[in-house]
């Protein structure tokens, strides 16, 4: 976003507007615009667009109206992205996870469901590829389930509202599969269950989304999301029984697929295509490492 301040009375102090996410550039004449590398890199055609036929008051009115129109459109886009929406997919995923845990528990065959749906390297290599996805809906115990569902509710309801239902679902499922694949590659003889790989994927997607909207989410990303990821990964290395490979695979997969599905109003088609290509390469690499290496 380019904001222009007119210093008509010598009262504009640019230092007031400088933050980690905002760069203030002082311009006295047209030549200053052409010399500034930052402006030229972000707005390569700004010099051409600043050429007007109007002069004096007419030029001032035209520039003011253009800026107001542009800011209004930007505000409408931001409102569209950040206005809360009902997180239907998040609720559906939570319900499925609860059903998969409690129904077989009440029926007395919980261990069988875990054995049939969990990710286990030898069975996956025998052709039971469905386990790579179904493992994300199975949990070892009630504490495991409640912890993951709380995390899914907190993170999912925000991210789904930001990026939309279909993007959210694609990121979630892709992250779950990537997490299972890396888990099979690193610990092939361990039974892996849980939604944490997919949830880490949501965190990876939130990182990329937050980068594009860093003027609004920059502080949250740096003070909350990144520390949360780092702390949980460190715990995964220190506490036995945690499948950190699934966490890392999901985190990377979620970030890459978020690039592929794109951030509304921010991502170009070029970025989306590159994101999908890199996601496919990463997926193929994981398949090779898990099934053929």
PLM region spans:
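Alpha-helical transmembrane segments that form the membrane-embedded catalytic/substrate-binding core
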Residues: 145-152, 193-205, 243-261
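Membrane-embedded catalytic cores of phosphoryl/pyrophosphoryl-handling enzymes
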Residues: 214-215, 220-230, 235-236
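Cytoplasmic-side transmembrane-helix entry/capping segments in multi-pass membrane proteins
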Residues: 166-171, 195-199, 219-226, 272-275
